[in-house]
């Protein structure tokens, strides 16, 4: 599902719900002569319960998407802070290790910014960037270790190594945040509820002598718009809503 465009998913869902609504109307028309006020009241009560349950699941899913978006935003800021701290602590290293560490961290910043622009569906490119990132982290760490070995008083270099360790941890946390999505099973459950609700609303409308399709279409459009927002929030590095890289850009 993550390989499909969010707009395509929302449009397909809209079409299926409208189709289910029309089928529901036809079924309601078929049952119209066999229905009385009690049947219509029961159908309306069930419809209200289903809509309430749908709103609960929809709100829960939206909350999950927002939490994951906030987590990714926080991870971006934390990584930028960790890199900035390591960059400042290069001044604690003796020459020539300070210049080597500064150059390596500058390269690391550019690599991380380049990684942040790659779609998660481009697996090969992401894998290559992750390998390059790990190799550069090791190079920065080796520079710190070499500086500690060459320095008779390694306290200052120890501060730098601590910052590098936090830099690596922040990278791991951000990588983990990118992999966390709303479980696909929840989306499938939502889609089943949406389609069933559309059919039920259509059936309830079909039981009436007069009906209007406009309210049902408006409700369907609002549902699909909310689904689009949820999916967009749940998909980092693609779509309309993305985590800004201001903190990382400021390190340049």
For the regions a language model picked out, list residue spans one by one.
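Alpha-helical transmembrane anchor segments
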Residues: 2-10, 14-33, 176-252
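A generic, lipid-embedded transmembrane alpha helix
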Residues: 44-62
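Short extracytoplasmic/periplasmic juxtamembrane "stem" segments immediately C-terminal to an N-terminal membrane anchor
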Residues: 76-93, 244-252
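Transmembrane signal-anchor/signal-peptide helices with a preference for the extracytoplasmic
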Residues: 57-78, 234
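N-terminal low-complexity, intrinsically disordered segments
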Residues: 34-45
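Juxtamembrane/interfacial segments around transmembrane helices
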Residues: 63, 97-113, 237-249
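Structured inter-helical modules in multipass membrane proteins
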Residues: 86-179
């Amino acid at each position: 599902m993550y390989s499909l465009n969010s707009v395509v998913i929302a449009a397909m869902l809209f079409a299926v719900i409208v189709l289910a609504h029309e089928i529901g109307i036809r079924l309601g028309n078929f049952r119209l002569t066999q229905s009385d006020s009690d049947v219509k009241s029961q159908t309306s009560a069930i419809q209200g319960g289903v809509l309430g349950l749908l709103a609960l699941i929809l709100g829960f899913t939206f909350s999950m998407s927002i939490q994951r978006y906030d987590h990714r935003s926080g991870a971006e800021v934390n990584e930028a802070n960790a890199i900035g701290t390591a960059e400042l602590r290069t001044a604690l290293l003796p020459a020539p290790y300070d210049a080597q560490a500064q150059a390596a961290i500058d390269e690391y910043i550019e690599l991380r910014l380049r990684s942040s622009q790659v779609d998660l569906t481009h697996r090969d490119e992401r894998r290559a960037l992750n390998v390059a990132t790990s190799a550069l982290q090791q190079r920065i760490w080796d520079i710190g270790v070499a500086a500690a070995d060459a320095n008779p008083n390694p306290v200052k270099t120890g501060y730098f190594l601590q910052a590098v360790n936090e830099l690596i941890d922040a990278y791991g946390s951000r990588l983990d945040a990118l992999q966390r999505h709303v479980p696909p099973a929840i989306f499938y459950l939502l889609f089943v509820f949406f389609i069933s609700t559309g059919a039920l609303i259509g059936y309830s409308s079909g039981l009436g002598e007069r009906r209007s399709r406009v309210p049902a279409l408006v409700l369907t459009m609002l549902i699909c718009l909310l689904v689009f927002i949820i999916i967009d929030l749940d998909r980092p590095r693609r779509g309309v809503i993305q985590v800004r890289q201001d903190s990382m850009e400021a390190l340049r």
